[in-house]
């Protein structure tokens, strides 16, 4: 699947020359640059979500543009989050495993268990 392939690619790029790959360049610049990108993309997702929500409220609105922007920005956020996880020697499988652990558990119960 795409997530598995992307995870493998991100691992390969960790050791690549920084002038050959955007991901390798991010890894070389380090965690602060990677986190800066995660923060930037988070903000862009928030703005795109707000724009999409506003567009949906307009009578007879065509929201295709705003929806596409939201999906695109979310993909950017996921991508940079995966780069962050890779840089920290983790990956999407760890997140999927955690989501699986939480599945079927009340959100309130799960939150209380973390305290």
Model-assigned labels for residue ranges:
Residues 1-74, 78-115:
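Flexible "arm" and connector segments at domain edges
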